[in-house]
Amino acid sequence: MYSSRPDLRPLTVGEMVDGAIRLYRTHFTTLIKIAAVVLGPIALIDVIATAAIGPVDMSTMLLVDPEANPMEVFEPLIPLYVVLMITSVLSFLGSTLVQGASISVLAHSYRGETIDWQTSLKTGARRLVPLVVATVLISLGSGIGLVFCLVPGIYLFTMWSVTPAALVTERLGAIRAMGRSFDLVRGRFWPVLGALVLSYLLYIVVSQIIGGVASAITVVSALASDQFSFLPSVIGSAIVQVVAAPFVASMVTIIYFDLRVRKEGYDLELMTRDLERMEGNDRRDLPPAGDDPFGLGSPGSR
């Protein structure tokens, strides 16, 4: 199927944010289906597990016996922590898959094409391992930079910001995609940072609105019954993930293509070649899909 495609021309910061919003709105149904199919079951697991464990009131436990053995006090929390760890890992993997699948949808839109959510999920699944590796490396690198000094962390995060788009669209390994992002953003640091800041401010606003509604419902539920008062909060968090994750992918995709237009004169011919590679139809000069997730290459490669 074909639809109107975004313009392949240099964009201002405001135009990038506006373009991301328009991309998100144009492909809203497909993007939400992707996020709901992946993240919905994870949220359901979280709800069922938390409901099965039940609420744990630490303050009441300590008041009943202030001199109790700490291990006895914290023992009821162990199942809760295990559930939180499992759902956190699943949420991370799910969010990464949603990002990759969303980028696939949005990249095709630049050629005026619309693909279904099933096809995009297959593309995201094929690129999941290198996406996970890249996300972990970027988080570690940026996190270390933020710990020692705020500026290096922000710098690294910005320079690596289009790694997911490069990884999915050009079928690169994690390390090569990070290097590709660095090359593309070099010389455009401030505009890219500005676009990212504006997009994350929008993300925060939407999250706060949904979270505020969920918190209000939680308070009302707690007054009625403590047993399931946690449900609105968990559901609210899931809705935030489903709604917001594709928008972040939209912003990353817009920035990525803007950089390629500016630096490489990116056009429809090059895009067609990229999309063929993304779908695995063009095997020239490419390693087998899923190989070399770190992007290091074989010992004898040049």
Feature map (PLM): residue ranges:
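Hydrophobic transmembrane alpha-helix segments characteristic of membrane transport
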Residues: L97-R126
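Long, highly hydrophobic alpha-helical transmembrane signal-anchor segments
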Residues: D57-L80, D116-V136
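Juxtamembrane transition segments at transmembrane-helix termini in multipass membrane proteins
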Residues: Y2, D7, V56-A68, S104, ...
